[in-house]
Amino acid sequence: MQKDAVNDRAKAGIFMSFQNPISIPGITVENFIRTAKSTITGENVRALSFKKELKEKMDELSFDLSYAQRYVNEGFSGGERKKNEILQMSILNPKLAILDETDSGLDVDAVRIVSEGVQRFHNEENAVLIITHHNQILQKLKPDYVHVLINGKIVKTGDASLVREIEEKGYDAYKALA
């Protein structure tokens, strides 16, 4: 899969958000997501129905509709960039969403909004993998599984209670297992 082009991965139903999403000058958020959706589905995305869906999803994320006409992530705060990634995920509706440090640098309100966006998205037909070093987002999401990864190796797996154990012991307690 690593050798596949990004658009092939997207067509296969894989979405990846990044810790520090890049800006794309000259491309509006609306145009970017609509083009991505069209490319992934292989169908022409009708403007009117797309605008309705975009507004609905932006409202859910407390994201002002004016951001749809701004260039992707240009001048966005860290929280706005993360909300934009959750917006993309919710509209593109992948089978697997990999969220890399989605909670990094977010204030309490932004963590709540992003967490709620992930909860609305997640269902029995998709999966969400959250990569994080902090437990704040995990407390809100209540993960089914928690894995501790040290030096590229999963050294411990558990349920949501493992988050509390990590909080108490710290990651150093797991380094010997690697």
Which stretches of residues belong to each language-model region?
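Walker B catalytic motif
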Residues: 98-102, 109
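ABC ATPase NBD Q-loop/coupling interface
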Residues: 1-9, 73
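Helical segment within the ABC ATPase nucleotide-binding domain
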Residues: 111-124
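Conserved H-loop
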Residues: 125-141
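Conserved beta-strand-loop-alpha-helix hinge in the C-terminal portion
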Residues: 145, 149, 153-176
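Catalytic "switch" loops of ABC-type ATPases
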Residues: 19-24, 133-134
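ABC-family P-loop ATPase nucleotide-binding domains
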Residues: 22-95
